[in-house]
Structures are given as structure tokens and as C-alpha cells.
């Protein structure tokens, strides 16, 4: 079989103008970027306001192996399958970060015959939104350090007299805004900035600093959660970057940099339109990770797609304990729109990995032995799929299971897995998906199940209400959402929690950063554990995004590269074609 990029390169694509017209967009509602990409003006929603909303289908997964179980390929393949059965459909996905593209997982365009195309343009830069987020974020960092430098150098009274600005009196020990970049670079997790030659201070105020990956930026979450440009601007102004010497928040509005940040992000408010290999219109917008952010594409993209099509297929990062939980408790409440149906992607290898019989770690190749028939491992790992089915049902949303088939899979084991699901819950429809090898044809049964399941109707119920305290919200996610027995907060986290509530931020949602490789915070614990503790070491305030960010276990907000990163496979041929991208 051809590689992903070869399949993409050998598939004829429609012009983006044709794709847009087929979706129901007008020429003046687009800004084209070459032959196959266009920015879609959110103002098109004014014209479409009377259109009935379509059905929202969210794709999640079991607890994945480090290489993933195929959510994106299923999202794209299902959209093509729905098109095959004559349904009006669009897909909405996140913009890939170059960190994973060059790191472990590779690209995020789908794969095989279920891809967003051109896949190289999607995976590398796209229309520059992530770079704009990075620039706007680091502008706030530069403004913060400049203000700190001038106030410290001159003294507060002299600074106020000279500039007519209020001295912010920033507490250098309580700066919370790190810098960001769109690469995996562990060496930047802890750095010192503002270093000077002896006797000089021209380079700023020396302090400890760190970098996060751009996907973890609060601005990325804001872009994904904003309902329009006005909302984006207001959220940017609420960002807290530090605290003053009295413990009061210092915001981007206080630094008078919020407007310039919004200007930098002006073009990012528009989703990027592309197409699948079978011509299904696809909106790409925002790229927050699900392990260290809220893990869903934008509300604006969903709004546009729901007005243009009968079905919108989107995905949430990692397993249902991760991106799906945040889709329900953060995104759905911000959008006032919950999914009508959830597709849970499962694989034989993923379930066997959850049996505890295999030791799969990031950077390791999947062993061939995992594809050998192993009933004991399959049945033990099936507990994880049961957990995820029950988890989706906690939110009152009906579920469909898509078994993503690999070429090495045993037909007998696929039949056994279908039987296990049917015995566990006969109301949960299940289909074997072969979208990687067959495109939309491989998702026709899945598409039919999704249409039928959407008609059941959802009775959506999030895990907590806005009025509950921050601690109650954390406990709801950990105990009800994960099955933990309790949370264990560090002294630092307890102090931060009390401070946030004192400042009036207890009405915010909560976003827990944890490993995606286990339902717990320990990646070595597989299956469907219960009764465990969730250690929370630190809280971060994301007042603009609208949530408090809890760091659990040893999760890092700046990933590192493995010993054999995927960038080693990338190159250009003599004609300038990219090779090795997957």
C-alpha cells in the first residue's frame, strides 16, 4: 500500500472554491490561501442564522496506546461514510501542532484513504494560526518583562511620574505567564532570562522562566472557546499573567497589551476550510491538546458546520476521560451545545494493551505479538471499553462503537469483540471500520448506526454546575468522571485554590491535565481501575479561557522529543516534494 503522503499526492482534489460552493458558502465569505485552503468568515453565520442546526457527532476513544487508536482517521472516514449514504456532512478537527508531527505521533490528518488533504499543508503551518497564537502569547510575555524592568529600574513613583501610567508593582515571585513555542523541547521547561554582564542591567530583570508548547497556551483555549471576535477580545483582556505585591491579579488589560494581542489574532478567528480525499468539506480551527488543555476544536467551526450540513463529525483528544470529558464540562457549556451522539473508537491492539499483558511506552514500537489471537488479553482489556461506554452514558449521550481494523487483525477476534459488546449492552451499536484502507466505503455501516443513534436524542447532563465550588468541581471530575476515591492536593494547590476563590474565580470550570495513557494519573495502570487517588500538585488560573487548570501527577506542559523522533524520516526530493510525512 502507498504511504499516506503518496495516497494524498495521487488523489485529484477539487478547488477550494468548488468545495466551498458545495458546502453552501458564497465566494465573498472566503479568503483563499492557494488552491486547496481558504479562511471562512465567521460573519457567514449572519446569513445562515435561520438554517436548522444539524446533528453533532463527537468521536472519542478507549484509553489509547502512545501511537493512538485512530480517532482522526475515523472522524474523516465517518464523514465520508455519511456522504456515501447521501447525508449532508462536514467534519471539524483541530489544527495539528508541529510538536507531535516532529515528535512521536507524526501528523494528524487521518491516514490511508481517510485523510484531510493536502496533508502536508495541514500538518505544517496550515494558514499560520498556531504561529499567530505563539506571537500573541509571547507579546504578552515581552510586555510583562518590559513593565517589570522599567518599574524596577526607575522605582514606582518615578515610573508613574514619568509615564503617567499606574505602577503595577508586579511580584516577580508570582509571575504565572510562561512563554510558548510550537515544538517539543524539554530543555526550555526551566530557564533563566534577563541575564546581564556584571554591573549592567540592560537585558531586563533576571528571573526564572519556562516555556510551554503553544497548544497549551491559554490563547489557544480562548480561540477554541470564543463565540465571536468580540468574545475573543474580551477573553484576552481577562487573562491573568501575574499577581502584584498585594496578591491582586495583573491582567493583559492592566499591561495595555490585550488590544495588540487581539490584533495579532484577528485572522485566526476564521476557521480554515479544506477537504477530505473524497471531497467532504472540513473545517480546521484551534489546536488545544487534551492532556494539557481542553482538547477540542473551536466552537465557531462547529457553529458554521452545523448551519451548513445535516451532520457534523468532530473529535475530542485521547480517551473519553480526557477530551470528551472536557467537551462536555467546558466546551458544551460555553457553546450551549452538546453532542447528539458519541462514537468510541476501539482497536484490538488498544484493548490488549489495556489488559496489562503488554508493556507499551512512548517511543516504543508496537510489538507484532500484540496482533496474535489472545482471548485472555482481549477479555481483560475489554474492561476498558466497558468503562468508556459507561462513561459516555454518564453524560446522557448515546454511544456507538467503531472497531478500527488493522490489516494484521484476526477476523475471529473482531467477531469476538463485537459479541462482547453486544452481550455487555445490546443497545450499543457496533461496526467494524475499515476507513484507512477503503475510505468512506469502509464506514457505511458505522454511518448508518450513527444516523439511527442520533435519532434517539440525548439527555445531556454535565458532571457539575457553575455554582459549585472549585473543589467540588475537581472532585466531580475525579470521583464521578474517573472513578477515583479522592483527590490529594499539595499545600501549594490548596493555597492556590483558596486564593482563586477569594478573588471570585470559583464560578469557573476545571480542566485537569493528566496522562492520556491511563484513566488514572499513573500511565502504568491500565484497564478500568477504581478507588485510586488523584494527586494535584498545582493549579493555574485561566480566567480568559474560563477554567482553572489543575496539573496532576507528573504531566508536562512542554513535551520532550524521543530518542528517534519522526523528524528523522522527513526530507525533500529534488522536485521539492515532502517525503516521509505520515
From Swiss-Prot:
<keyword id="KW-0436">Ligase</keyword>
<dbReference type="InterPro" id="IPR020628">
    <property type="entry name" value="Formate_THF_ligase_CS"/>
</dbReference>
<dbReference type="Pfam" id="PF01268">
    <property type="entry name" value="FTHFS"/>
</dbReference>
<feature type="binding site">
    <location>
        <begin position="65"/>
        <end position="72"/>
    </location>
    <ligand>
        <name>ATP</name>
    </ligand>
</feature>
<comment type="pathway">
    <text>One-carbon metabolism; tetrahydrofolate interconversion.</text>
</comment>
<keyword id="KW-0554">One-carbon metabolism</keyword>
<dbReference type="GO" id="GO:0005524">
    <property type="term" value="F:ATP binding"/>
</dbReference>
<dbReference type="GO" id="GO:0035999">
    <property type="term" value="P:tetrahydrofolate interconversion"/>
</dbReference>
<keyword id="KW-0067">ATP-binding</keyword>
<comment type="similarity">
    <text>Belongs to the formate--tetrahydrofolate ligase family.</text>
</comment>
<dbReference type="InterPro" id="IPR027417">
    <property type="entry name" value="P-loop_NTPase"/>
</dbReference>
<keyword id="KW-0547">Nucleotide-binding</keyword>
<dbReference type="GO" id="GO:0004329">
    <property type="term" value="F:formate-tetrahydrofolate ligase activity"/>
</dbReference>
<dbReference type="InterPro" id="IPR000559">
    <property type="entry name" value="Formate_THF_ligase"/>
</dbReference>
<protein>
    <recommendedName>
        <fullName>Formate--tetrahydrofolate ligase</fullName>
        <ecNumber>6.3.4.3</ecNumber>
    </recommendedName>
</protein>
